[in-house]
Structure formats: structure tokens, C-alpha cells
Amino acid sequence: MNTQVVLITGALTGIGRAAAVAFAKKGAKVVVSGRRDEAGKALAAELRSFGSEAEFINADVRKEDDVRVLVDKTVARFGRLDVAVNNAATEGAVGPITEQTAESFAATFDTNVLGVVLSMKHEVRAMQAQGSGNIVNISSTYGHEGAAFASIYVGAKHAVEGITQSVALELAKSGIRVNAVAPGPTDTGMLTRFTGTAENKAALAAQVPLGRLGFPEEVADGIVFIASNEARFITGHVLNVDGGHSAN
């Protein structure tokens, strides 16, 4: 990863933050993005402490102008874009389908699906100009499973996987690989909000064949691998990092 330029959306917490640290420790130049200036600048400073060149750029992936500026600033600062990790997401509304609204649907899909589409649009343009690149979209094991009372989130992650595989085929001969990483139950703030109680969280962990929740750093290892040259013959793939959850 040394000298490669990596852009990560939703980078300020959880899996995004762990991925930023993992890439920085491997010598990549890292641009982290999110919507909280203080946290973003602090993360960039932390990444620089590992010897990485790092920048924070505030952007809302739901807004195309923000995404365009994010990619343009990345290329202007570092000259290219080698790896894009589209991680920005929200857990959305949890509850029965009878309680969902147009607003709860839009709130989830605008970030989890539209945000990925807009990000890929501008990332691909930058990568096409240089003739190479890697895109890693962050899905979930719920991107190929069902989950009661999480229909909107599950639907959004199914969409991410379908978009990933379709764009991978679209770009297969262009030098750009497109893959997804699907975390299983991972100990993040989003999971804590999603499960609601410590008891629910423990029950979810008990369903994992390896007997525990994953750590963000373990998902980050999968992201770094799928973006690396070791995975050069892999495109259109969804890599489960889930402790065996999807095989259960």
C-alpha cells in the first residue's frame, strides 16, 4: 500500500476509522471524510503520527456537490486516487414494516445507497483518468440475508451488493476492480444502537459460530486485503468477514 492514495467515507468511527488506521500503518496516503470537523481533524493527526500523509475533508455523501469536491480535492492534493472505501452508512429505522414511512426509507437509502452511487460515480471518473483503481463498498451480511424488523436497512445493503457486482462487470476491462466487504456482527457504535440493549447484543454474539462479535480491526484487515495487489484477480466479489455468521 506504500504510496497509494486511499479515500474513506464514513471514516470517523467504527469500521471506517479502523480501515483508515490500517491503511496508514501500511504507508498509504489517506483522506478521511465525514461530517464532524473536530473528530476528522483529530483522526487525520493520528494517522500522520504513523508516518502517513493524511487529510480530512468534510463531506456529506448524500450531496453530489460534496462528493465531487471530495474526490477533486483528493486528486488535487495527492495527484491520483488508488483506493476508495465507501463506508458511510446509517442503521436506519428499526421496527415492523407497518411502522415504516417514506421519510424513514429515504433517510436510510439516501446515505446507504445513493451515497454509494454518488461516491462511485466520481471515484470511477478519477480512476478512469489514470487507468486503474480499486473500489471497496461496505455492505453487511444483511446484504444477502433477511432480518426481521430491519427491512429498510437490509434492503439498502442488498442494493449495495447488486450495485457493486453490476459496476464490477461494467468496469472489468478498465483496470478498475470493484468489490464489497460484508461484516457480520461487529462491535461498533452502530451495532450498539441497532441492538438497543446489552442483552440483545449478547444474544447476537451468541449466534456467531466463532462465539463472539467481530472487531472493527478484523473487518479492516479484509478491506485492506481486497484492495491490495494480492487480490488482483478478484472483482465483483462480496467478502464476508463475519465469524461464520453467513454460513450458519
Whereabouts are the PLM-identified features?
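Conserved mid-core segment of classical short-chain dehydrogenase/reductases
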Residues: 68, 91-106, 125, 129, ...
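Short, flexible catalytic-loop segment of classical short-chain dehydrogenase/reductase
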Residues: 37, 161, 178, 182-193
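Short C-terminal tail/terminal secondary-structure segment
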Residues: 91-94, 145, 224, 235-248
